[in-house]
Amino acid sequence: MFWKFDLHSSSHIDTLLEREDVTLKELMDEEDVLQECKAQNRKLIEFLLKAECLEDLVSFIIEEPPQDMDEKIRYKYPNISCELLTSDVSQMNDRLGEDESLLMKLYSFLLNESPLNPLLASFFSKVLSILISRKPEQIVDFLKKKRDFVDLIIKHIGTSAIMDLLLRLLTCIEPPQPRQDVLNWLNEERIIQRLVEIVHPSQEEDRHSNASQSLCEIVRLSRDQMLQVQNSTEPDPLLATLEKQEIIEQLLSNIFHKEKNESAIVSAIQILLTLLETRRPTFEGHIEICPPGMSHSACSVNKSVLEAIRGRLGSFHELLLEPPKKSVMKTTWGILDPPVGNTRLNVIRLISSLLQTNTSSINGDLMELNSIGVILDMFFKYTWNNFLHTQVEICIALILASPFENAENGTITDQDSTGDNLLLKHLFQKCQLIERILEAWDTNEKKQAEGGRRHGYMGHLTRIANCIVHSTDKGPNSALVQQLIKDLPDEVRERWETFCTNSLGETNKRNTVDLAFSDYQMQQMTSNFIDQFGFNDEKFADQDDIGNVSFDRVSDINFTLNTNESGNIALFEACCKERIQQFDDGGSDEEDIWEEKHIAFTPESQRRSSSGSTDSEESTDSEEEDGAKQDLFESSSANTEDKMEVDLNEPPTWSANFDVPMETTHGAPLDSVGSDVWSTEEPMPTKETGWASFSEFTSSLSTKESLRSNSPVEMETSTESVDPLTPGAAALATQPEAPGSMAMEASSDGEEDAESTDKVTETVMNGGMKETLSLTVDAKTETAVFKSEEEKLSTSQDAACKDAEETPEPAEAKCTAPLTPSSSPEQRTDQPSMPSDPSVNGPV
C-alpha cells in the first residue's frame, strides 16, 4: 500500500545522477543508495557499471583506509562498496566475473603481508564468495591459473575470513561435476597435508584453531555430500586423503613432538573426534550410531584411523597423568592444583569415542594402561567439574552396554554371555567400581550429617549406580554383570544390596516426584476440583482421603443462584416465549424463529413519543445495566418465582419493541414517583390461568389525577410488603386488595372517531395496587396500543401533540400489537376512547 500509491519520498539519487560531474562518493553518501541498487534503479546501475566506478569500488575493499581518518567514517566507503558489489545484481556480477583486470585487482588483496586486516578480509571474502556461487566456472578457472592461490590461503589461514573463503569454495559450487573438479584440484594442491602441518606446537594458536576447524568442516561436508548423493561413483578425495593412516600419524607426531602445547593437542583431538563420529552428534555427549546393516562409508569409522590412534594411546595416557603445565586456579570451592584443564578433558572425550567403536584391540590397550582407573580417580578428585563427570559417566555406560566382540573374526555376540569381556571385568575387579560408589556415598552422607555441602558428583553417581542395576537385569552383558556382583566379597555384596534397596531406592523415589502438581493431567483435574471445592485453606492441599472420583460427578455441581429475578429478566423471558415458538413445534420447522416481524405504529403511539418524553425514556444503557444488577440481588421469597404466563398454543400474531428500559412505578401521585420504585413488597400469589379474563370490569383510578411520568409498568406481580416509611406508601395502603389476576377493561367508541380506533382499558396488578391501562385499537392496521388513563394531557398539551404529529420524532419505546381474529367480543365496550392519552411502554 505504501509503495503502490507512491507515498514514499522521492530519492535524491535520481537528481544527482542527472548531473554530469557527480562522483561515486557523493552517491555513496546517500542513505538510500543500497535500497536503490537492490531495487534495480536503472540509472544507478548504469553509473556503477562504468569501468572507473567498479575499479573504485574494488579499491575501497582491498586498500587500507588512511589512519588519520575518524574511526566512525574510516570504514564507511569499504562497507558500502562491499554491500553494493554483493547486492546480487546480475549485470554487476557478469561484469566482475568477465573482467579479468578487476578480478586480478581483487585477488591482489591476498598478496598483502600477514596478518590481514580482519574487516577488509571479510569484505574481500564476501565479494569473492558471491562470485564463486554466481560465476563458478569463470572464477574457478581464474583461481586455477594462480599457482600461489593455495599457498596464500594457507599463509593467511589464521584470518577467519580466509578460512571461510576456503569453505565457501567447497560448498558454494552446486553442480556435481564442477564441484568434483574443485575437490580434485585442491587435493592435487595437497591442501589436506598443508593444513595438517599447521597443527604443530611451533605455529600460533589462531592458526591451530582455524586449520583444525577447516579439516573438521571438510570431513563433515564430505560425509553429508556422500549421504545425499548415494550413486556417486567417485569418492571424496579430500576425505580419503585425511583418513589415510600416514596422515593421522603425521598429525599425532606433530602434537607429541618435544614440548606439549595445549592448543595443538586440543586442535588435533578435535580432528580425531570428527573422524571418529560417524555422523554429527545430535547433542553434546551423544554419539549417533549408524543404523544396523548400513555399510555406507559415511556411517563407519575407517580402520586406518583406529590403527593410527592405537599406536599413540600410551602418549594420550601420559597426558592424563602429566598434562601441560597450568597455573594454580583459585575458585569459590577452593584451590585447584592442577586444574583439570582442556587437554585432559579432551583426552577423556577421545577415550569415550574409542569405546563407542567397541574395538577389542583398543579395549585391551586401555585395560593394560588402566586409563579407565585414572579417569575414575579424576571423577572423585574433582568434585565440582561437571564436564568431567559427564564424560566419565558416558565411558562407564558404554562399557556396560557394549556387546562382546569376538577378536578372532570380529563378530559381535548379542546374546547374554559370560564371555571374556575383559574391559568389563577390569571395571569391576581392578577399578573396584562398586566399592568406590559405596565409599563415596557413605562419605557424602557423613559430610551432610555434619552440616557440610553435598558433593557435586552425587547426581552422576546415582545415574551410574542405576546403570549398573539396569545392566544386571537386562542388556547384552547382564549375565556377566550378575556373575561379577556374585564374585564380590560377602560384605561388599551385602552392602551393595542394602544400598540398592534403601539409599538408591529412596533417592530414585525422591527424584521421580514431579515439581508440579501430581495430578496435572486434564482427566484428573475435574475430579480433584469437585472434591476440593469449598475446602478451607488448611485443608485444601490435604488429599490423603480423596479417592478416585468418577467423571459423572460433574453433574452434581449446582451453579444456580438463589437470587430474586428482576422485572427486566421476567419481561425478557415473556418476550422470548411470545416471539419464539418451541423448537419441538412441528408446525414451525420452516419458519425462521429469528426473523424480524413487522412493527406498526399508530398515530397515538407517535403522539405519545413526541409529547410524553420523560427522564425514564432518556435513560442511558449504563443506567439500565445498573438497574438490572441491582434487581438481580434484591431479596425475595425463595419459594416464590413470579413469571408471566403466556399461551404458547397460538402462533404469535403481534410484535413488540422492547429496546427501552422497563422501569416500574406505582400508580401514586407524581411527587411520589421515583422514591418508591425500588421498595420491597410482599409477593402475592398469582393465578396460573385466566390472566386474560375480561369479564371482571372495574373502574380504574380517577382520570382527574395528576399526570405521572411516562415510565413503563412493571410486567410482573409483586406482593412484597410495603415499607411504611417510603413515600407513597399511604396511597398504596388505601387501595383495596385486588385478586391475583389481571382484568382487562375494554371500551370502544362509535362512529364519532374518524380514525375508527377502539380503546380497551386493562387493570394491572402492580405490587399491592391496581393500575389501569388503555388499549387503543386502530381499525385500519388492527394494532393495539396500551395506555395508562393516568396520563392525561391538558388542552395545551393536546395542541402540542397535534403539532408533534405533523413532525413526528423517531418512535422510541413503542409496543403495538395487532388484534387477533379470535379476540373475545367482550373486549369492546361503549366507553369512549381518549385519543390524547400517551400509551404505556410495554405489553402486558
Curated annotation (Swiss-Prot):
**Which of UniProt's keywords are assigned here?**
Cytoplasm, Nucleus, Phosphoprotein
Instruction: Return the annotated region ranges for Disordered.
Output: 599-844
GO terms for cellular component: cytoplasm; nucleus
Query: List-wise, which residues carry Phosphoserine?
Result: S315, S550, S588, S605, S693, S824
InterPro entries noted in UniProt: ARM-type_fold, SAPS
Against SUPFAM superfamilies, the record matches this protein to: ARM repeat (SSF48371)
Q: Name one GO molecular function term.
A: protein phosphatase regulator activity
Q: In which tissues is it expressed?
A: Strongest expression observed in lung, spleen, bladder and liver and weaker levels present in brain, heart, kidney, skeletal muscle and pancreas.
Phosphothreonine PTM positions = T602, T820
Where would you find this protein in the cell?
Cytoplasm; Nucleus
In which residue ranges is the amino acid composition biased (Polar residues)?
A: 695-721, 819-844
Biased composition annotated in UniProt, kind: Acidic residues: 615-626
Tell me yes or no: is Nucleus among this UniProt entry's keywords: yes
Q: Which family does it belong to?
A: Belongs to the SAPS family.
- Fill in the subunit field for this protein: Protein phosphatase 6 (PP6) holoenzyme is proposed to be a heterotrimeric complex formed by the catalytic subunit, a SAPS domain-containing subunit (PP6R) and an ankyrin repeat-domain containing regulatory subunit (ARS). Interacts with PPP6C and ANKRD28.
Q: What does the record give as the function of this protein?
A: Regulatory subunit of protein phosphatase 6 (PP6). May function as a scaffolding PP6 subunit. May have an important role in maintaining immune self-tolerance.
Protein name per Swiss-Prot or TrEMBL = Serine/threonine-protein phosphatase 6 regulatory subunit 3
What is the originating organism of this protein?
Answer: Mus musculus
